[in-house]
């Protein structure tokens, strides 16, 4: 039986593009693990995707995952089927332009084949303590690398 994991993720950017950070909180029962990272030149969307990638890569075995993000870009790409359309349509958008952040989307595609991931949208910068913690981790990653 697969372990059930709850993940919260967030990304931040100082300037867009600019210096970026991401943060994630992984919860398994009573155990919590926080991870974060930094990029010197990036976008907010790349940091949102990176948070999800790094969190899923931190899992040591295939798991059932509920992943919570305030990123409509991330959640909608999965829930509205954009990612499937992009991957089966030669990585172009409906307007025939190349999909942005293909490298990260391809990685997410690999990871959601390994793990059973359900994506959930949460409201950012509100009263969700876990999302707020991830926002703090992402912003601290930027601050610590100035």
UniProtKB/Swiss-Prot annotation:
Family: Belongs to the RNase H family.
Residues given in the record as Mg(2+) 1 binding sites: 10, 48, 70
Source species: Prosthecochloris aestuarii (strain DSM 271 / SK 413)
Catalytically driven reaction(s): Endonucleolytic cleavage to 5'-phosphomonoester
Protein name as annotated: Ribonuclease H
Places the protein is found: Cytoplasm
Record-linked SUPFAM superfamilies: Ribonuclease H-like (SSF53098)
Enzyme Commission code(s) on record: 3.1.26.4
Residue stretches making up the RNase H type-1 domain: 1-143
Function: Endonuclease that specifically degrades the RNA of RNA-DNA hybrids.
Domain of life: Bacteria
PROSITE patterns: RNASE_H_1
Cofactor(s) listed: Mg(2+)
Pfam families linked to this entry: RNase_H (PF00075)
GO biological process, one term: DNA replication, removal of RNA primer
GO cellular component, one term: cytoplasm
Oligomer status and interactors: Monomer.
Keywords: Cytoplasm, Endonuclease, Hydrolase, Magnesium, Metal-binding, Nuclease
Keyword Phosphoprotein found: no
């Amino acid at each position: 039986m697969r372990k059930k994991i709850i993940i919260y993720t967030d990304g931040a950017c100082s300037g867009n593009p600019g210096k970026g950070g991401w943060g994630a909180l992984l919860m398994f029962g009573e155990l919590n693990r926080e991870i974060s990272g930094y990029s010197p030149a990036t976008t907010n969307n790349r940091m949102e995707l990176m948070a999800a990638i790094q969190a899923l890569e931190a899992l040591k075995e295939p798991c059932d995952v509920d992943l919570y993000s305030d990123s409509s870009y991330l959640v909608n790409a999965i829930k509205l089927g954009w990612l499937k359309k992009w991957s089966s349509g030669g990585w172009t958008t409906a307007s025939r332009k190349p999909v942005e952040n293909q490298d990260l989307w391809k990685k997410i595609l690999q990871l959601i084949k390994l793990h059973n991931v359900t994506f959930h949208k949460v409201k950012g910068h509100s009263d969700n303590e876990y999302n707020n913690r991830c926002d703090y981790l992402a912003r601290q990653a930027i601050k610590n690398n100035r």
